[in-house]
């Protein structure tokens, strides 16, 4: 699952999910036996074996927008759900984005931090310094927060064979794009699908996206 903002917005019904609707969605997941895992956990189990919960779900947030820390994070904590925050590193500590202290709190609460590049460029349509955006963002996050970032999210959900291979070769164990596929395997660990949750979805539409009812 992919979210961008959890906040009120009367005009943007794609990227903004209202806090009330988000709380209802998280309650639905809990009521239906879903357990949140991280992308790193999924990759580890697929590669090396192990056991996942009966109904695993990965709840991701792209860009590091500050609103989800004050709206989504408390709701998820109450439901004992963890998430994955894919951060654009040059936006950390900027207005309306997560602060370094907030990122640290997420880490201490069991959240995974992933890379969403340094500047969020369209790496498919434009010439981009892949080493800077893909490797540099990981190194910056690793050093600043004392972690080992192993998950990547492609900006705009876009990738190609060159970009996928670059991510594969530079310290990541998985990478995510957009898409509705729910079955993941070792063959697509660097092309994982995430269903984008729009603010216009009602609860019936949300439930229909979930693999277990």
Question: What is each residue range found by the language model?
Answer:
Residues 73-80, 98-115, 168-169, 186:
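Acidic (Asp/Glu)-rich catalytic clusters
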Residues 1-2, 35-39, 58, 77-93, ...:
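Short, well-structured secondary-structure segments
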């Amino acid at each position: 699952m992919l979210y961008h903002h959890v906040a009120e917005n009367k005009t943007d019904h794609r990227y903004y999910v209202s806090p009330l609707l988000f709380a209802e969605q998280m309650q639905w997941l809990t009521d239906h036996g879903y357990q949140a895992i991280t992308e790193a956990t999924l990759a580890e189990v697929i590669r090396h074996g192990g056991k996942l919960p009966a109904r695993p779900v990965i709840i991701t947030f792209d860009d590091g927008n500050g609103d989800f820390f004050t709206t989504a994070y408390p709701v998820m904590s109450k439901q004992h759900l963890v998430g994955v925050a894919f951060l654009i590193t040059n936006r950390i500590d900027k207005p309306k984005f997560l602060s370094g202290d907030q990122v640290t709190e997420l880490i201490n609460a069991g959240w995974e931090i992933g890379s969403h590049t340094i500047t969020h460029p369209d790496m498919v349509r434009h010439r981009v310094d892949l080493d800077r955006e893909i490797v540099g963002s990981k190194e910056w996050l690793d050093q600043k927060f004392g972690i080992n970032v192993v998950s990547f999210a492609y900006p705009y959900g876009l990738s190609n064979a060159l970009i996928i291979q670059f991510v594969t070769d530079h310290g990541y164990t998985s990478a995510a794009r957009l898409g509705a596929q729910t079955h993941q395997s070792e063959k697509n660990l660097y092309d994982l699908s995430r269903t984008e949750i729009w603010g216009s979805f009602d609860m019936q539409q949300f439930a229909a996206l979930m693999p277990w009812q």
